[in-house]
Structure formats: structure tokens, C-alpha cells
């Protein structure tokens, strides 16, 4: 058995390097000083993980529901501003300020592109209780890993077929197709064609400095060119502030290094760490893009819908109905996906829930308003934070019931090492959405799958952040 697993490991590593399932390793100080770049495979499971088919399909069905929900909320300027005005978080307040400015000036571009990902965990706290899915979070900006997720699905198909594992419980008929890379690049291409002001325009990908997950991003760039003959350029926000301008005579066209931008696609800008210049260069770039005619992915409104406070407020009685008011089935599906979500803002904090969380912190998670992995508070730290933070500090978090999943044994490969772990997984469903103004919906569809597995004793699951690894499901 061990010999077979090692053989699978070597086959998997070779396939990963040959097919772009790779990322840049974090450099040592010496390597950084000498500009040495080392590449490794993205951590992956050796074979697919078993998953409840009914719940998988339920998660996929929710994709279009959440797309419409994000769209409807993004149209309600007053709801976003009023709901988030008391969030004690400078980052969120800066986003709100940009929205106020561009709405006052008048939105230049009616077309918007959304590339979203809704993440779910499978809840089964009590033995014998029916398993169900709960939403962990909804990502409305920089929904990454679509390219490498496609690769790990193909890796598993290769390993199963190559090693005759179909009879070992890994029937490829139960292994879903995942074209997340193509679906997302196609949506960017469609937005580019809708812009269609100048045939020589290009797509702008806004990136972080020192990006290690570059090959996931490059995969989209290559697909845009090979499938659609569309050029993509990459710039950091600091670079954009230096080299971008608006051509006011032509309706606020965004020009970067002399090139007209059709779509501004953010793979950065979701964390305060992306806005560090003392002169506010990155915030100036964000405002410039938002003021422009370029199609934004996301718009500032779409970004704000992803703030955790919105997730918490939607779970309150009567709120969701304002935004899903003509489809009872959709309303019930979305409601069913909500776990317990509680405000920590001083205006509406529920002290009985806070007291319970202090007494049983292992049953709760504190989540900050912003996106990006590694910022949540778990276990005993929840009680410490609730007791020590000021009311202003608490308002920058929400409290959430911890989703309890059953763990399973699996074999994984990280840094060329074969490991047996007790794992848990998180299922992400990509979706794409294009609207031309408030009421003209051009595209609304599910756009692929991301399955990330982590060790059962790990709280976070981010792959780029170093917590999780890529997986794929076998449905049963």
C-alpha cells in the first residue's frame, strides 16, 4: 500500500509541474536579496474526497440565487451606506467614501462584471442529524484559484484513469466536470466585448506586489489570448496611480501606459495590506478606476456587498425578503444556507449571545469585515477578544456559529512530502454575472468548483495563505 501511495505521489508531482499546478515558494531572506525564485507544486490531495451529491447540487443551485442577491443589494445605495456606516473599520469606511463620491458624480459605466465565489461547509454536529450545508462567506472580489482548481480536477482524473482506481470507489462518472478557468475567462471576454468602444482596448488585472499565486492568474491571461485574442496587462495599484489617467474628453476612458482599459479586474485591493503608501497612492488608484468608463470587476458596490456585516444583517428577519421578493424557492434556498450570524455593533449587539460565546467559545467564530484568509478569531481567543475589545473594536467583527463538520482520513502531498491527515473540506462555488444597468441581466450562471481541504485541527483553509490544499469531490 505504501509503495502504491508513493508511486501516486510521484506521478502527481510530475503531472502538477508539467500542467501548471504550481506556485512560487516564499523566498528566504537570502533568496529575496539575490532575486532567486523557487517554484513548487500547489499542495493537493492524492485522490478525490467523498461528498454528499444532494448537498453538492444544492450548493451549485445557490450560485444564481446569490448572483441576483448581490446585484439587488448593490443597487440599494442607502442600504449599503446605512448598514455599514457604524462599522469601526477604516478600510470599510474608505470604500464607503469612494462609493459616495462616484454616486454623487454619476456612475460612468452601467455595465458591471461579477466573478464571485460562495464558500460552504457541511454541518453535522450531532451523530444521526441530517447533514446540511451552511455558507461560510461570499467572496465578491478577487475570487482566486479557478485555474489551479481546474488543474487538480484534471490531475485526479489522470491518476484515477492511469492507475485503474475506478473500481476502488473512485468512479469518474461521479467526478464532476470543472471548467472554472474557462468559465471565468469567458466572462471577462464577454465583458470586454460589451465594452467594445475601442478594438485595441485591453483588460487590466490589478495585482499585489510579490504575488506568489501568479500561475493561477496567468492561466486566465493565456486563455483570454488563446480563446479570444484579448490582451491582458498586469499592474499593482501603486503602479496604476503613477501611470493611469482618465481621458475626460472621451467620457472618462481609463488609460494605463497609453492603453485603453476595457475591464478592470481586481486580484488585489481586498485587504488593508494592499493600501499601505503614506501618500494614499493605492486609494487614489482605486478612486480613479471607479470614476472611469472601464467595466469594473467588482464595482465598489459589489465589493461592499461582500463585507461580513451585510452577511449578518441579511440573516435578520425580513431583510432578505427585500432583495429576493419574487422567487419563493430562491428565498428559501438562500435562507437555508445561513448559519447563526450575530451583530457585535453597539447599536444592536445581543449580550445573551455574547455571554454564551464567552462561556463556550469553541462553538463560535469572530470574523472581520474584510476579505482575505487568516484574520478570523477562534476557540479561546473568541472569549478573550469579546472580553477585552472596546465596543468600537467589536463593531469591526461579526459573530458566527461555528460550522461542525465530520473529519475524514486522506493522503495529501505538500512540498513533495506524502502525508496522511485527518481532514475537513470547504466547498466553493464560482459564479459569474454581468448586468447592463439595473434591470438588463446579460449573464448569470454557476462557473465552476473549488474544493479546499485542511487538517481537522486547523481553523483556516486558504491555500495561498498556506493553510489548506486543493481537492476535488467524488459524489455519492
Swiss-Prot record:
ATP binds at residues 137, 308, 367-376, 378, 400-403, 426, 454, 460. Substrate binds at residues 117, 141-144, 211-213, 217, 267-270, 452, 463-464. Pathway: Sulfur metabolism; glutathione biosynthesis; glutathione from L-cysteine and L-glutamate: step 2/2. Its EC number is 6.3.2.3. One of its GO terms (cellular component) is cytosol. Binds 1 Mg(2+) ion per subunit. One of its GO terms (molecular function) is magnesium ion binding. Its cofactor is Mg(2+). Keywords: ATP-binding, Glutathione biosynthesis, Ligase, Magnesium, Metal-binding, Nucleotide-binding. Belongs to the eukaryotic GSH synthase family. This is Glutathione synthetase. It comes from Dictyostelium discoideum. The gene is gshB.
Amino acid at each position: 500500500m505504501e509503495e502504491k501511495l508513493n508511486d501516486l505521489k510521484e506521478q502527481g508531482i510530475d503531472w502538477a509541474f508539467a500542467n501548471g499546478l504550481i506556485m512560487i515558494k516564499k523566498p528566504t531572506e537570502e533568496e529575496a536579496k539575490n532575486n532567486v525564485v523557487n517554484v513548487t507544486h500547489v499542495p493537493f490531495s492524492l485522490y478525490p474526497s467523498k461528498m454528499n451529491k444532494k448537498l453538492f447540487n444544492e450548493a451549485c443551485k445557490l450560485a444564481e440565487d446569490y448572483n441576483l442577491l448581490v446585484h439587488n443589494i448593490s443597487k440599494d445605495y442607502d442600504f449599503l451606506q446605512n448598514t455599514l456606516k457604524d462599522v469601526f473599520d477604516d478600510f470599510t469606511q474608505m470604500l464607503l467614501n469612494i462609493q459616495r463620491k462616484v454616486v454623487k458624480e454619476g456612475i460612468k459605466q452601467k455595465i458591471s462584471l461579477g466573478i464571485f465565489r460562495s464558500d460552504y461547509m457541511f454541518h453535522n454536529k450531532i451523530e444521526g442529524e441530517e447533514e446540511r450545508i451552511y455558507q461560510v462567506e461570499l467572496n465578491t472580489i478577487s475570487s482566486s484559484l479557478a485555474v489551479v482548481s481546474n488543474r487538480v480536477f484534471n490531475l485526479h482524473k489522470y491518476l484515477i484513469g492511469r492507475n485503474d482506481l475506478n473500481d476502488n470507489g473512485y468512479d469518474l462518472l461521479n467526478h464532476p466536470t470543472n471548467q472554472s478557468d474557462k468559465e471565468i475567462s469567458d466572462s471577462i471576454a464577454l465583458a470586454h466585448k460589451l465594452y467594445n468602444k475601442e478594438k485595441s482596448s485591453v483588460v487590466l488585472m490589478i495585482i499585489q506586489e510579490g504575488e506568489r499565486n501568479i500561475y493561477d492568474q496567468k492561466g486566465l491571461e493565456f486563455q483570454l489570448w488563446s480563446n479570444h485574442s484579448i490582451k491582458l496587462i498586469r499592474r499593482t495599484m501603486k503602479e496604476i496611480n503613477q501611470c493611469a489617467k482618465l481621458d475626460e474628453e472621451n467620457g472618462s476612458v481609463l488609460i494605463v501606459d497609453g492603453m485603453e482599459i476595457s475591464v478592470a479586474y481586481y486580484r488585489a485591493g481586498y485587504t488593508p495590506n494592499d493600501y499601505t503608501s503614506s501618500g494614499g497612492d493605492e486609494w487614489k488608484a482605486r478612486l480613479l478606476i471607479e470614476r472611469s468608463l472601464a467595466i469594473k470587476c467588482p464595482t465598489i458596490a459589489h465589493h461592499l456587498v461582500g463585507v461580513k456585516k451585510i452577511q449578518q444583517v441579511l440573516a435578520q428577519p425580513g431583510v432578505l425578503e427585500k432583495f429576493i421578493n419574487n422567487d419563493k424557492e430562491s428565498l428559501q434556498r438562500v435562507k437555508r444556507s445561513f448559519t447563526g450570524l450575530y451583530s457585535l455593533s453597539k447599536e444592536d449587539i445581543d449580550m445573551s449571545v455574547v455571554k454564551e460565546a464567552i462561556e463556550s467559545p469553541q462553538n463560535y467564530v469572530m470574523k472581520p469585515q474584510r476579505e482575505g484568509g487568516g484574520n478570523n478569531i477562534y476557540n479561546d481567543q473568541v472569549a478573550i477578544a469579546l472580553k477585552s475589545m472596546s465596543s468600537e473594536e467589536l463593531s469591526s467583527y461579526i459573530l458566527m456559529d461555528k460550522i461542525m463538520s465530520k473529519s475524514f482520513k486522506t493522503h495529501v502531498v505538500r512540498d513533495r512530502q506524502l502525508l496522511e491527515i485527518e481532514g475537513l473540506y470547504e466547498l466553493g462555488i464560482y459564479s459569474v454575472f454581468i448586468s447592463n444597468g439595473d434591470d438588463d441581466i446579460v449573464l448569470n450562471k454557476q462557473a465552476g468548483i473549488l474544493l479546499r481541504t485542511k487538517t481537522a485541527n486547523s481553523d483556516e483553509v486558504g491555500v495561498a495563505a498556506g493553510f489548506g490544499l486543493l481537492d476535488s469531490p467524488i459524489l455519492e
